[in-house]
Structures are given as structure tokens and as C-alpha cells.
């Protein structure tokens, strides 16, 4: 089984999203963090179970259920790279510059 690894940029995005949610609703930042970690477990279990964005690149997306958040990941030969944790309505495809 391939394991997931967060890129530094994705770590920063997750931390920022957790803080933003917690400021709006105390305690909910932890719920967001937990849901992202659960998503990572599902991604590791079913690596290719979620669709790619389009034919322009290898990125796949996992949409969270309870939060307006998408986990963007790329499957390599050795691992699953979590390249972005997109919270809210950020500019579509901004993470593609990270390739």
C-alpha cells in the first residue's frame, strides 16, 4: 500500500483552514482536521478511487462531506503526494504551479 505525504504547501493550507474554521466556530477546526485525516486514510486505501480534475494533469480530488474543502493529490510510483488542501472558493487550479 502506498502512503500519503503532505507537501509543505499543503501542510500550511491545512493549518490555515483549521485556524480559519476554529475562529468562526470554536472546536470545529479539529473536526475539519479529523475529516481531512480520514480522507487521507480512504485515499490510501482506494488510491485511484477519486476522479482526476481533467486531462491536463494527474491530480485527483477528494471532496470532504462536511466542509467546503477538497484534498488534491497525485499518485507517484512510490507514494501519494497531498499537493493541496483547498478550503473555500480559492482560484481553481492554483496548485498546478507546484508541479
Name these PLM-found stretches.
Residues 67-70, 74-99:
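Enriched for short, Lys/Arg-rich terminal
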Residues 1-35:
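Arg/Lys-rich, positively charged N-terminal/basic patches that mediate binding to nucleic acids
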Residues 30-31, 51-53, 94:
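Short, hydrophobic secondary-structure boundary micro-motifs
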Residues 38, 45-79:
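Basic/aromatic recognition patch in beta-strand/loop cores that engages polyanionic ligands
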Residues 19, 26, 41, 45-48, ...:
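Generic structural signal for secondary-structure transition and capping sites
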Amino acid at each position: 500500500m502506498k502512503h500519503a505525504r503532505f507537501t509543505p504547501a499543503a501542510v500550511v493550507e491545512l493549518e490555515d483552514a483549521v485556524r480559519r474554521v476554529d475562529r468562526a466556530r470554536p472546536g470545529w477546526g479539529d473536526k475539519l482536521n479529523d475529516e481531512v485525516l480520514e480522507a487521507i486514510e480512504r485515499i490510501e486505501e482506494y488510491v485511484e478511487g477519486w476522479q482526476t480534475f481533467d486531462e491536463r494533469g494527474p491530480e485527483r480530488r477528494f471532496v470532504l462531506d462536511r466542509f467546503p474543502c477538497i484534498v488534491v493529490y497525485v499518485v507517484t510510483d512510490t507514494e501519494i503526494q497531498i499537493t493541496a488542501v483547498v478550503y473555500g472558493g480559492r482560484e481553481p487550479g492554483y496548485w498546478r504551479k507546484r508541479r
